[in-house]
Amino acid sequence: MLESFQADKAAGCGRQNSDKEVNEMYKIGTFNKISPVGLDKLTDEYVIVEDQNEANGIILRSYDMNDMEFSEDLLAIGRAGAGTNNVPVDRCSELGIVVFNAPGANANAVKELCLCGMIMAARNVPDGIAWAKTLKGSEGVGPQIEKGKGQFAGTEILGKTLGLIGLGAIGRLVADAALALGMNVLGYDAFMSDALKEQLPQGVMVVEDLAELYPQCDYISIHVPANDATKGMMNAAAFAQMKDGVIFLNFARDKLMNDDDLLAALASGKVAKYVTDFADDAVLNADEPGIIVLPHLGASSAEAEDNCAAMAVTQVMDYIENGNIKNSVNMPNANLGPKGSCPRLSVICKANAEPDVMFKLNELELANVVCETRGDYSYILADLEDKTIDLQVAGVIRARII
């Protein structure tokens, strides 16, 4: 089913798929425990293999692939979740391997845990639970509880102001739920657009600068990806602009925090509580009572695991069978719909090679062609009349006939 692409192997022509029998099944490798709901999406044209070197596609959750070597048969990697820090995305791009994720599939699960964390922090629930357990086996528990419960009295979230940093799928759901609970919601997104504003729940006050958000909020929750621009963005300068006693929630990524500055803000009382879904050494070893640590439970619901796996599997299948790309983190989206009876050409190339590839295709006067570029890479998808085409073009990374 994955036929070799008959292009001359001139210098710079790129990576070619080895010949395969027409009736050979597509091979899928897995890491971690993948939900059966996702794997059940695979048709009888697919087989799950243990040897990852045989795989045409790999589905995984949090397994760290950064040190793995990839075979030339590997076409796609599907991350059953949003973050791809465990996948060597840049190296995959260089090899012509499309990396998919599942944005939004776990958004509701993270939203619910974020709300849980906010209320736990506001009402001192973890401390109260821990204290109640110390009463086990003692006499006169009732009077002790009535006498001691006052030390855990907290505040309600009704009427308080929540600041959201990042208004993607999760941020928008948190905003909607917080508004329903009677909170005021301020939102900031570095990539704010008119289209994004239209997706926001009515009632969200959008700010253009974090400096406007920080001093107004009783709670701040961050929902942005971890990258070079956001690493350590929550630092002393940011904390200094916040309200005294702010409750900060991080269900996004641990690398967003400057740990030393965070601990200093907790020690000074600037940050009253820090709720995080990332149990790293910095917070686990800290002697600060205001830290509430969860063991990365954000997407750990049965529903989220099902949704993420189903999305990842479906996207990998669509790329393998039809060449369509949706929700890739390293290649542009492109779609020609289901493949018909004619052969379909799929080309991944450097962006500067795209004009030369398109020149070759334009000579064929094809009716069904899509060409998209993202950063340094271009992706071309075209329906052909013949299974053979000459592509002696430098900069082509992977080309295949489907």
Kindly give the residue locations of the regions a language model identified.
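An N-terminal-biased, well-structured beta-alpha scaffold segment characteristic
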Residues: 22-102, 235-237, 247, 258, ...
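Rossmann-like adenosine-cofactor binding region
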Residues: 63-68, 190-284, 300
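Phosphate-binding beta-alpha-beta segment of Rossmann-like dinucleotide-binding domains, i.e.
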Residues: 103-161, 327
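Oxidoreductase and adenylate-handling cofactor-binding alpha/beta cores
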Residues: 111-130, 176-183, 310-324
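Glycine-rich Rossmann-fold phosphate-binding loop(s) that bind the pyrophosphate
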Residues: 167-168
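N-terminal Rossmann-fold NAD(P) dinucleotide-binding loop
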Residues: 171-172
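Rossmann-like dinucleotide-binding domain for NAD(H)/NADP(H)
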Residues: 184, 240, 244-351, 375, ...
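Short amphipathic alpha-helix segments
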Residues: 349-367, 388
